[in-house]
Design a protein with these regions (language model features):
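Residue-level recognition of the N-termini of beta-strands and the immediately preceding loop/turn
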Residues: 1, 34, 109-112
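Residue-identity detector for threonine
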Residues: 2, 29, 67, 122-124, ...
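Nucleotide and nucleotide-moiety/phosphate-recognizing core
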Residues: 3-4, 9-78
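Conserved active-site and cofactor/substrate-binding residues in soluble primary-metabolism enzymes
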Residues: 15, 19, 41, 66, ...
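Predominant activation on well-ordered alpha-helical scaffold segments within soluble catalytic domains
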Residues: 18-22, 47, 95-98, 139, ...
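Generic secondary-structure boundary/loop-capping signal
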Residues: 41, 68-71, 89, 118-120, ...
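Active-site-adjacent loop/tail segments of enzyme domains
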Residues: 71-95
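Phosphate/ribose-phosphate-bearing ligand recognition and processing surfaces
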Residues: 83-87, 94, 101-178
Length: 178
């Protein structure tokens, strides 16, 4: 299984997926082999990751008409064609990559998007208060999904806080997911 955190930490709540992937990587060990990737805004560059995966969990914010901090777990097939992090003609989102795989006759991995409705997508670091308040619940939904698929987790002794991850993102030499 592969977890891919998607988003832009320079655009406040849009960075949620990257922060969530880093948080899971830093704070948990897992019973099965699981790859955690900071996908950032890579789009098309994640195509080879998708081709090598049989099960993908995409962590991202979802621009839906709902209350900020609402959490969704949606099979990628149900939102295929819409593309997450679609930044325009020059950028291809991860779901569009799956569409490309299907058009090329390649096997598309089982995929789910676990997303949260953003409160603020502006050019600044950090997360809005609404998303910070919902973050632990969001992580819990991700962990429940993993457990449901036979991947148990254990919290590590020396944990990294969300604030530490946000501060790490502000440091150009910082590494979000090692």
């Amino acid at each position: 299984m592969t977890l891919i955190g998607i988003g832009n930490v320079l655009q406040k709540d849009d960075g949620l997926g990257v922060y969530a992937a880093s948080y899971l990587n830093d704070n948990y060990t897992f019973s099965e082999k699981i790859e955690i990737i900071n996908g950032g805004v890579e789009g098309i560059h994640l195509l080879n990751v998708l081709e090598e995966s049989d099960h993908v969990v995409v962590l991202d914010c979802l621009q839906l008409d709902d209350t900020p901090a609402s959490i969704y777990a949606i099979p990628a097939k149900e939102i295929s064609g819409y593309g997450l992090n679609n930044g325009g003609a020059h950028e291809i989102g991860i779901l569009q990559c799956m569409d490309m795989m299907e058009l090329q006759g390649k096997e598309v991995p089982e995929a789910i998007v676990i997303g949260i409705v953003p409160a603020e997508v502006t050019f600044t670091f950090g997360l809005s208060d609404e998303i910070v308040d919902a973050f632990e619940g969001y992580i819990s939904v991700v962990l429940q999904y993993l457990s449901k698929h036979g991947i148990n987790h254990q919290k590590v002794a020396n944990t990294t806080t969300l604030l530490e991850l946000i501060n790490r993102a502000k440091d150009p030499s910082g590494v979000m997911v090692s």
